[in-house]
Amino acid sequence: MKIILLGAPGAGKGTQSTSIAEHFGLQRISTGDMLRNAAKEGKPLGLEAKKIMDAGQLVSDDIIMALIKECLSKDECSCGVLFDGFPRTIGQAEALRAEEIHIDHVVEIYVQDEEIVKRMSGRRVHLASGRSYHVMFNPPKQEGLDDATGEPLVQRADDSEETVKKRLQIYHAQTAPLVEYYTMLEQKGESNAPRYHKIEGVGTVEEIRNRIFAALES
């Protein structure tokens, strides 16, 4: 089984990707991890990708596809894979089909933007320990202070409302065409078209996980 998992920042994709991979015995492939590992191992493609990333540029689809094909050839991927954060563009999706890497399911964890802004902009952290709080869902005993040390909590720059909204705009611009691409493949009855599942991402971790499992097992 090969699954693509989509979800906006703050939609809970990271939590659910682990559960899906464990439940179905899949190897999780994250392009970010894959690029970092290839560079760390000193592979030519990895070093080339690192040079591009260090220059602040986007790694080409050709390099990413070559690394993905290499990953898929490994024994640990023989039982199936979960693509986390890939594809990001129509070009990458078409490259998968051109390489005859057939996807069985595309799962999008959907959460409204207002809810994501509320989730992410409410996060507060104690930098020294990494302890995390939320002003609404998991507040500290004393507002703005770490429970254990009494030291001030901070909001990371990535979690500011303005930054979260910008990240959501980028996500929607990338993902909307992908969703349309995969739903059209399914509607046209194209050969090896994956099934697309839009999963409501509001609820407990267990509720959302069960919705995903039910969709994939139906």
Swiss-Prot record:
Which parts of this chain are annotated as the region NMP? Answer: 30-59
Alphabetized, the UniProt keywords read:
ATP-binding, Cytoplasm, Kinase, Nucleotide biosynthesis, Nucleotide-binding, Transferase
A GO cellular component entry from the record: cytoplasm
- Which terms does the record give in the GO molecular function aspect? adenylate kinase activity; ATP binding
Tell me yes or no: is Cytoplasm among this UniProt entry's keywords: yes
Q: Provide the binding site for AMP.
A: 31, 36, 57-59, 85-88, 92, 156, 167
The family database entries (PROSITE patterns) matched by this protein are listed as: ADENYLATE_KINASE
In residue numbers, the region (LID) covers: 122-159
Q: Which CDD domains match?
A: ADK
Provide an example Pfam family for this protein: ADK
Q: What pathway is this protein a component of?
A: Purine metabolism; AMP biosynthesis via salvage pathway; AMP from ADP: step 1/1
State the similarity comment. Answer: Belongs to the adenylate kinase family.
Q: What does this gene product do?
A: Catalyzes the reversible transfer of the terminal phosphate group between ATP and AMP. Plays an important role in cellular energy homeostasis and in adenine nucleotide metabolism.
Q: How does it assemble?
A: Monomer.
Q: What is this protein called?
A: Adenylate kinase
